[in-house]
Amino acid sequence: MMNRFRKWLYKPKRSDPQLLARFYYADEELNQVAAELDSLDGRKDPQRCTLLVSQFRSCQDNVLNIINQIMDECIPQDRAPRDFCVKFPEEIRHDNLAGQLWFGAECLAAGSIIMNRELESMAMRPLAKELTRSLEDVRGALRDQALRDLNTYTEKMREALRHFDVLFAEFELSYVSAMVPVKSPREYYVQQEVIVLFCETVERALDFGYLTQDMIDDYEPALMFSIPRLAIVCGLVVYADGPLNLDRKVEDMSELFRPFHTLLRKIRDLLQTLTEEELHTLERNLCISQDVEFPIRADVQGPAALAPALSAPLPPEGPLSAKAKDPDAELACSMQYDDQELEQLSRMVHRAGDEMSSLLSPPIACQSPAHRPGAEGSPGGEASPGRPRLRSGSDEEERVFFMDDVEGTAEALARPESPAGPFGWAGSTWADPQEKGQGGPGGAAGISLPASEKEEDLSNNNLEAEGTDGASLAGTSSCSCLDSRLHLDGWEVGADDAETAEMIAHRTGGMKLSATVIFNPKSPTSLDSAVATQEAASEPVAEGMDGGPHKLSTGATNCLLHSCVCCGSCGDSREDVVERLREKCSPGGVIGASYAAGLAKASDRAPERQEEAPPPSEDASNGREPKAPTSDKCLPHTSGSQVDTASGLQGEAGVAGQQEPEARELHAGSPSAHEAPQALSGSSSSTAGSCSSDKMGPEAAPAATHAAPQATREKIRSRFHGSHDLIHRLFVCISGVADQLQTNYASDLRSILKTLFEVMATKPETDDKEKLRKVTQTLRSAALEDCALCQETLSSSELAAKTRDGDFEDPPEWVPDEACGFCTACKAPFTVIRRKHHCRSCGKIFCSRCSSHSAPLPRYGQVKPVRVCTHCYMFHVTPFYSDKAGL
């Protein structure tokens, strides 16, 4: 009864501007909405329930904002520190955050659990309960004080506010940290490095003319796409020691680029092969906001291995020629991703994926022996005990665009599964060459082709070969991602392996395809590829001299010739092949470090394998070379270690002394030996291996080291059909990475670009300052001579300091009504209709038209807007026209 009487007697007015009075009515409104929400059945009237919940959240925001103002006024020196708020993302820091935290605390205190945050919810529940209790105590103390004295803050109320402020700050940090990632100081430092990289990129783009200063000053929307793309290029090749330094640990990279570490490494290797003009062409294409085409430049010649492929156009019936002639296949990633462009890009990517699948598996019309049943008499058709099988599962790695789909299969096929082969090659791989060569027409090693079909197949693939040796020679460029056990006399691979390749090709769509098509899988750097073996020259000669029916089908030959499209198996020129054979087969050759553990097992089996091979002199006299164990021509590296071939293994086991004379005899004596390198150099797909310096003789090491960069560059570039193809695929991959940042890291990228625009925007020059000073002087001349405020010399900062200290000035004296019969500004006489109005700023009398503005006057203690004249509003109230308040 006493409280009701006190409430009726001391209840503050609704129009009272004091904080306690405003809190009282805001709290009353919150209680009313809460009571109505409790009494409402949400199932009967869901719309009304939704409306009340929204209103309830709004009332909570209002109450907390007023409490925050009271704490600023009551305990300004005792506020809990909130420096951690700078680590919150921009979308979190808004005015409604306090209300959301209150709502979340009540839900947690009631027993609710944040979705996918069970552990964090259980850890925060005690704090949430304590926070809600403290908030109720604060509300009760403020309500009670509002009914007593609006101008007094008791010590009890101050203590309640301090306790609540500490709890609320602690809960804010815990709740936001559980919901969104909060950066550490190290991550902020790395992000600042990225900002510096972006600024340097824009500075370089301005110097080269890629961008204009007007685009930056106008905040051109296309820059949201152009700048990240250019930053990737600059970070990889121009400022290689910056935040995109791939030689550092992955953990030290910015979280923006950390998921793309593998892809960025391969992009960097390709960027390093570009000429300066090609780099400028790529950067210009990355800046434009329309579909781009990559013309073939006449001044930049492709590598020697690509000369025949570029000179002769592909026929329309070839699978790759259809891709090259299709304009959609050359569609570049545009910066403006509207629905139509996304649909076109999706169609193009899936079409390329279908073509990829056709490359990975032979055409149905020309079914290869790999898809034939194993009952046709071929030794490879049966499942040998040593045949490697695909493993059901592989180690989970950080995959970018699912690039490892293909390389995972290659690794699984290369892993040892039985003691029969220490390196995963066993069974029919080591079979007697005579057994393979005398299979007869009925063998399933391959199908013979008429001469016309052979010539047509060779011409379709731009292969310069003579006679019938070209069809069998095409098999020398087989690669691991297509078939781990391809032989020149047939495809000895199980149906499971081929089906797995088809499944991988079917999955390889979207940006996954671009990463798989362009780069050699599982290669630490594109400079280190696979190592060519002696079979590159020896086996084609054997097949050519044999003249047997063991020829690849048209589909198989077509697939093998273009195997570089799917795994990057590329080749050397004629001289490189012969030189590599000499260096590779030297007596001083050693095996790679990654396979050192297998040497012990291999050496135990070396005598048996040596007996299987016929003597080299006998084979040389017959025009045939001994069959070395068939191995992958483009076996990918793992963990940066060198991968040796089976011929190198045999040389280490004791046959290396015989291999060097054989290689030289092959080069000097046999006519077919000259055809093999020539055909290899003319094909668009040849071996991309590189011999490391430790496998060469001492006299050849310095020269090879000197020529290594240029040779490696040519090997990498030979994987592409030309400069335009390389630039186009780099454009697609770089755009894919940069545009992913817009989706995955929108907040960080927005913060980086915001800082970038603040730094790179045009600063006001001296001339602009002079113009501003002249305008200010002109406006000052319009000041009234009889205005006391215009004659003051106090600056705005001094007035602000006086206002902050609470030293309010006395309002000006009003001019008496009877002393003025005209408007001070327009001199219009006052009538019954045109009434008098006093300006609260200067105290003079004006008509309603000349005093139509309202503004607060903090220097006089007026917090709410009051009537002021036009002159005071323009020159004394708002700071837009002068740097002094006392004009």
UniProtKB/Swiss-Prot annotation:
Zinc fingers (FYVE-type), renumbered ranges: 817-879
Biased composition (Low complexity): 681-693, 700-711
Spans annotated as Disordered: 308-327, 354-396, 412-474, 599-714
Any one GO MF annotation of this record: zinc ion binding
Keywords for this protein: Cytoplasm, Endosome, Isopeptide bond, Membrane, Metal-binding, Phosphoprotein, Ubl conjugation, Zinc, Zinc-finger
Glycyl lysine isopeptide (Lys-Gly) (interchain with G-Cter in ubiquitin), cross-linked positions: 87
Compartments, record wording: Cytoplasm, Cytosol; Early endosome membrane
Binding residue positions for Zn(2+) 1: 823, 826, 847, 850
Binding locations of Zn(2+) 2: 839, 842, 869, 872
Pfam family, one: FYVE
Gene Ontology CC: cytosol; early endosome membrane
Annotated domain remarks: The FYVE-type zinc finger mediates the interaction with phosphatidylinositol 3-phosphate (PI3P) and localization to early endosome membranes when not monoubiquitinated at Lys-87.
Subunit comment: Interacts with TRIM3.
Function: Negative regulator of epidermal growth factor receptor (EGFR) signaling. Acts by promoting EGFR degradation in endosomes when not monoubiquitinated.
Descriptive protein name: Lateral signaling target protein 2 homolog
Gene name of this polypeptide: ZFYVE28
